């Protein structure tokens, strides 16, 4: 018997990431090749954006995806989020010329407060929320705080792009297939301060740290390369990374819903005080997923260098949080 369709909301649906994301969702990459989906697409109530969204929907129709059971266009989150199972919050206010980070935070606080309230009002209480739009961790925190009736654990931020970027850098360094690397961790904020940590990682069962055995490469090449990869792509392409961000969003939700088979992945999730990270801070942690739930990998040893890096990225998150506290409900 065919499965009942799942409802997936995507915000910023006519944007660059949306364009890379929607066709893959409709093709079954997000929730499985036997799972029909209904897309509920949100764009800003601007004539140009809504017209662009119509064009994207025309293209989606023209793909004749067997799993696409329906789609609707919206300019109001109160209708876009009705009865949804999954929310991909991609749309966010980009940083314009001369804009301070605090201006960016407050502009996004308004968007994500409204979206959190709408999720609280009309989405399923079991909705799985992934925030992609930057600053992703803090935007997820704002949405979570604006939706008191949805469990906090259902709000996540995307660290998977950093995770995947780190995996590919390690694979290149070791000249091995990327799929052979396991147990990589990315701690903290989705920003250049995040800390990719391969101390526990294995390749073909052997320690990645021992195989590389180069602390200077870790500190001076690996960590900065992963941290500044987004900027390097803008420099090369003239546009921000959209397809790789969409791919990471698909990986994140796919694994959360369908499981990781014991493999470690990185998700930005609300802390419960693990690893000395204050409760409710949305922070990149290592997790495994099964039966639609993620579970943190606990008890990993934190050395002095790692603690320093983890505190540095935490301080940035706490600063962002402090910057939006007065805007929260």
Swiss-Prot record:
One of the GO biological process terms: tricarboxylic acid cycle
Catalytic reaction annotation: (S)-malate + NAD(+) = oxaloacetate + NADH + H(+)
Binding-site residues for substrate, renumbered to this chain: 95, 101, 134, 165
Alphabetical UniProt keywords: NAD, Oxidoreductase, Tricarboxylic acid cycle
Entry EC number(s): 1.1.1.37
InterPro entries xref list: L-lactate/malate_DH, Lactate/malate_DH_C, Lactate/malate_DH_N, Lactate_DH/Glyco_Ohase_4_C, Malate_DH_type2, NAD(P)-bd_dom_sf
Gene Ontology MF annotations: L-malate dehydrogenase (NAD+) activity
Active site positions, chain numbering: 190 (proton acceptor)
Protein residues bound to NAD(+): 12-18, 108, 115, 132-134
Function text: Catalyzes the reversible oxidation of malate to oxaloacetate.
Protein family per UniProt: Belongs to the LDH/MDH superfamily. MDH type 2 family.
Name by which UniProt lists this protein: Malate dehydrogenase
